[in-house]
């Protein structure tokens, strides 16, 4: 068993995903209405986490939006990243966290995020072995991708509001790709 003091911590922020095969690494994130899906293949000894802001894309990915904030994109990236590291789809298992209702509005984005993640995993045939979603407070999540161990800490009201402020900040748009071709 890896001592927590010796574990190397890798922080996952909104719009990111990481795939790890090192038992001494713990992935960590802070969630409000966002959701983190933690997937692993226990036989291959590889796992990962993503952190998404919204469930799906309202418009085409070619419309110039930042696809990394959407669950549909990050779920595919995480699964493909695991497969590239030797995982097999039929051995994947998932844990899902987040999706709190952090803002009093008619729309509950957190609930939509959590429902999206659960439906996506169900559609892909990936069993959810554990989940902690919903509520009114954010959470800090730690996930050891090789062992599958996960731990969460509830955030206070003030901490949740800080997380809400971060989630509402616009994600930096990726630099435009230069489509020009230069011939030598």
Curated annotation (Swiss-Prot):
Its EC number is 3.5.1.44. Transmembrane segments: none annotated. Gene3D superfamilies: 3.30.1330.200. One of its GO terms (molecular function) is protein-glutamine glutaminase activity. It holds the Pfam family CheD. It is an enzyme of class 3 (hydrolase). It catalyses: L-glutaminyl-[protein] + H2O = L-glutamyl-[protein] + NH4(+). Keywords: Chemotaxis, Hydrolase. GO terms for biological process: chemotaxis. It comes from the Bacteria. NCBIfam families: PRK13497.1 (NF010019). Probably deamidates glutamine residues to glutamate on methyl-accepting chemotaxis receptors (MCPs), playing an important role in chemotaxis. Belongs to the CheD family. PANTHER family: CHEMORECEPTOR GLUTAMINE DEAMIDASE CHED-RELATED. This is Probable chemoreceptor glutamine deamidase CheD. It comes from Rhizobium rhizogenes (strain K84 / ATCC BAA-868).
